[in-house]
């Protein structure tokens, strides 16, 4: 996979990308990342990339020229292609696991990271997706883009040590992940559930599914609306929602 990132703060992106899973993917030659400082493409004599909005208003907007020219550079380095272009924007669709799975199918992704008050609307003619990390405000798009990149790259083939890790993660099944334990069996009186020590994998799977449903119902009931639930799952949920008499 090839990923391009357009940003005003390349160091915010370059350093984290060479750590952990994403860094291993780069080292293994399964991922190639280029980071472009679009300020370098400003034709303004002062190198400005922002200006006041027409009609008034607080803050400054990113001007189209530097980003358009930076995208031309990306095209020149990638056989005249920018791949699938993602604008990191608080007004976009909220990022989720399904979107990460969709991105992981692409050969080339380009992320545009904003700053200041927002973008000149004409910049959006360059993009395929406008994506937000959530309903909160951060200073720029770099941290959000890094999160999306990490969530996407870990889904690529042969990136994780255990191929089942990505499948078992929270949200991959539409539910939150079940509780997990490791050694020791008893830590300061806090014991591992006996079912996990039984060796009965059928019962363990049942316990994990029930715990996953229980956690999702308590913390993210909205996920149950789109999760693929079996008749057994629905019965478990009915029992969980029935108060003890």
Curated annotation (Swiss-Prot):
Pfam families: tRNA_m1G_MT
MF GO annotations: tRNA (guanine(37)-N1)-methyltransferase activity
The keyword Methyltransferase belongs to this UniProt entry's keyword annotation: yes
Binding of S-adenosyl-L-methionine, residues: 114, 133-138
Key word Amino-acid biosynthesis present: no
InterPro entries noted in UniProt: Alpha/beta_knot_MTases, tRNA_m1G_MeTrfase_C_sf, tRNA_m1G_MeTrfase_TrmD, tRNA_m1G_MTases_N, tRNA_MeTrfase_TRMD/TRM10
GO BP annotations listed: tRNA N1-guanine methylation
Reaction(s) catalysed by this chain's protein: guanosine(37) in tRNA + S-adenosyl-L-methionine = N(1)-methylguanosine(37) in tRNA + S-adenosyl-L-homocysteine + H(+)
Gene3D superfamilies assigned: 3.40.1280.10, tRNA(m1g37)methyltransferase, domain 2 (1.10.1270.20)
Family from the record: Belongs to the RNA methyltransferase TrmD family.
Assembly and binders: Homodimer.
Full protein name: tRNA (guanine-N(1)-)-methyltransferase
């Amino acid at each position: 996979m090839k990923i391009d990132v357009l940003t005003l703060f390349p160091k915010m992106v370059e350093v984290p990308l060479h750590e952990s899973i994403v860094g291993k993917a780069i080292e293994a030659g399964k991922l190639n990342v280029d980071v472009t400082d679009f300020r370098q493409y400003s034709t303004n004599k002062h190198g400005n990339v922002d200006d006041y909005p027409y009609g008034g208003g607080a803050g400054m907007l990113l001007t189209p020229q530097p980003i358009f020219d930076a995208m031309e550079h990306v095209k020149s380095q990638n056989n005249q292609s920018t791949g699938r272009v993602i604008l990191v924007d608080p007004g976009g669709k909220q990022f989720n696991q399904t979107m990460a799975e969709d991105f992981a199918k692409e050969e080339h992704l380009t992320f545009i990271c904003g700053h200041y008050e927002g973008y000149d609307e004409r910049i959006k003619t360059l993009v395929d997706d406008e994506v937000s990390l959530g309903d909160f405000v951060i200073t720029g798009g770099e941290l959000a883009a890094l999160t999306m990149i990490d969530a996407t790259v870990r889904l690529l083939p042969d990136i994780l040590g255990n191929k089942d890790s990505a499948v078992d993660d929270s949200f991959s099944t539409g539910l939150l992940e079940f509780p997990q334990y490791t050694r020791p069996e008893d830590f300061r009186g806090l014991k591992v559930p006996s079912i996990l020590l039984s060796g009965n994998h059928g019962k363990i799977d049942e316990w994990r599914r029930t715990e996953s449903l229980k956690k999702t119902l308590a913390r993210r009931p909205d996920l149950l609306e789109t999760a693929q639930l079996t008749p057994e799952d629905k019965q478990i949920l009915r029992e969980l929602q029935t108060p003890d008499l």
